[in-house]
Regions:
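Distinct, well-ordered alpha-helical segments
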Residues: 24-28, 68-83, 101-109
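Structural preference for beta-strand elements that scaffold enzyme active sites
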Residues: 10-14, 58-62, 85-90, 118-121, ...
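Aromatic-rich peripheral "rim/lid" segments of glycoside hydrolase catalytic domains that contact
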Residues: 5-8, 14, 19-42, 47, ...
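Short, acidic/polar
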Residues: 1-3, 69-79, 158-167
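Active-site beta-loop-alpha junctions enriched in small/polar residues
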Residues: 15-18, 64-68, 91-96, 124-127, ...
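Active-site lining segments of carbohydrate-active enzymes
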Residues: 47-62
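Surface-exposed cleft-lining segments at the edges of enzyme active sites
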Residues: 31-37, 61-63, 91-99
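Substrate-binding cleft/loops of secretory-pathway carbohydrate-active enzymes
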Residues: 62-92, 130-136, 185-187
Length: 219
């Protein structure tokens, strides 16, 4: 329905999200997990991609996941072998437990570039406050009443953001990068936004604005 309604207006669609865990995921009861349990992951993926392609043959269709291990690579391989019309690979990079660092970012890009498809960093977050404990496996399980931004971590956030976007924007394989939270508290109540709760910009906002303007502003 949505793809048909916005045909010709929206180019890129995240067709299906987080399929790596779907075969065993039963934490939340919803239509997607029930359908996957009944018919299998690949059947579900093939059906939703076919429906999206039929609704808008010119749209660019993404598969997307937070899992950047070889399990995601295997899912992509199976999809391509089955003829699923994937146009780009989505990578989530919610870094609530700490910045990935340049080495991991480059390694992830290199591994997923082997498919010959554009790589999109679809959900990127960097914190300017206390990090989530490393033992948390599902980020949604971490629920706190107060999660404040901290001045010295705001500096760290903008430094990490600058390094990360420098890598992404200069990679021939990465074609898009989306910052997930504009304001603090938008997801998990985390201080992961570019602006604070009161709407004032953090150093990361100014840094990203400068990066974008210097690269894309009309000459």
């Amino acid at each position: 329905r949505e793809v048909s309604h916005f045909k010709g207006k929206i180019t890129y669609w995240d067709v299906i999200n987080e399929t790596v865990i779907l075969p065993v995921f039963n934490k939340y009861d919803n239509a997607v997990s029930r359908i996957c349990a009944r018919y299998g992951r690949m059947t579900l993926i093939k059906e939703v991609f076919a429906a999206a392609k039929a609704a808008d043959p010119e749209a660019q269709l993404l598969i997307n996941d937070f899992n950047t291990t070889d399990k995601y690579e295997k899912v992509i391989e199976e999809c391509l072998q089955a003829g699923v019309p994937i146009d780009a690979i989505g990578i989530q990079s919610h870094q609530h437990q700490g910045y990935w660092g340049a080495k991991k970012i480059k390694e992830v890009i290199e591994r997923f570039s082997r498919f010959g498809l554009p790589v999109h960093f679809t959900e990127n977050t960097l914190l300017s406050g206390m990090l989530m404990p490393p033992e948390i496996e599902d980020l949604n399980d971490y629920q706190v009443k107060s999660w404040d931004t901290v001045p010295f971590m705001e500096i760290r956030q903008q430094e990490d953001l600058a390094e990360m976007y420098g890598i992404l924007l200069n990679s021939p394989y990465v074609k898009a990068a989306t910052y997930w939270d504009f304001a603090d508290g938008a997801w998990l109540n985390a201080p992961s936004g570019l602006v604070r709760v009161d709407g004032t910009p953090k150093p990361a906002y100014d840094r990203l604005k400068s990066i974008v303007e210097s690269r894309y502003a009309a000459k």
